[in-house]
UniProtKB/Swiss-Prot annotation:
UniProt name for this protein: C-type lectin domain family 12 member B
UniProt keywords, alphabetically: Cell membrane, Disulfide bond, Glycoprotein, Lectin, Membrane, Phosphoprotein, Receptor, Signal-anchor, Transmembrane, Transmembrane helix
GO cellular component, one term: external side of plasma membrane
Stretches in topological domain Cytoplasmic: 1-43
Tissues expressed in: Detected in colon, heart, kidney, liver, lung, mammary gland, ovary, spleen and testis. Expressed in melanocytes (at protein level).
Pfam family, one: Ly49
Posttranslational modification: N-glycosylated.
GO MF, one example: carbohydrate binding
Topology of this chain in the membrane: Single-pass type II membrane protein
SUPFAM superfamilies xrefs: C-type lectin-like
Superkingdom in the source lineage: Eukaryota
Amino acid sequence: MSEEVTYATLTFQDSAGARNNRDGNNLRKRGHPAPSPIWRHAALGLVTLCLMLLIGLVTLGMMFLQISNDINSDSEKLSQLQKTIQQQQDNLSQQLGNSNNLSMEEEFLKSQISSVLKRQEQMAIKLCQELIIHTSDHRCNPCPKMWQWYQNSCYYFTTNEEKTWANSRKDCIDKNSTLVKIDSLEEKDFLMSQPLLMFSFFWLGLSWDSSGRSWFWEDGSVPSPSLFSTKELDQINGSKGCAYFQKGNIYISRCSAEIFWICEKTAAPVKTEDLD
């Protein structure tokens, strides 16, 4: 009888323990439910996103580092290029400075040579004038025979016949010259000093141009008022015709009048070899 009770008790206890275990498991299951599949996917996506962001940041960092290195390299190249350009500019400036110095030296030498040649020409002219005055044994003849030499011009005073202004002009052209033109007071004084002009009338290359309503020299230039006295200006402004020289003054007459005339042409240069 006691064995049966014991068996029953053990059986009861085992059954109660198993039940207690099952109840404990059920309680644990109810207290800590299993994770939901949706949250698991969300967590996985978040981790993946973090990894992608991390990879992106690393990639951007590497790109930034590479770009920084490239910029630094380009900056060094640019700095070197600027130094090279500056050096070339300095060299060019120095060369230009040397060229300017050479140009200044060249101009100085040219001016010196020009000055020497001018003095030599003046001395040759003076010597030639002395030879013409004092001797006939020379080859210095800047003007043809019967022509008078003054400064850079030769003058021919016609006294063997009288002609109108137009015919006198033609005769000068035939002599490869023109009717005289007064360019300066010195030239006017030279003409006034000629004895022939004290007693005779001589045509000048000054005439009234009716088409232009003005006075012109043979070369087309307008006479300068500073070359004429007040009396002469009154003559010129109050008359129309052709100008002539007489007794050191300029007068106006009919161009058809027949008087003497003066031709003028450029003198030949004086050659030093003709002074021997």
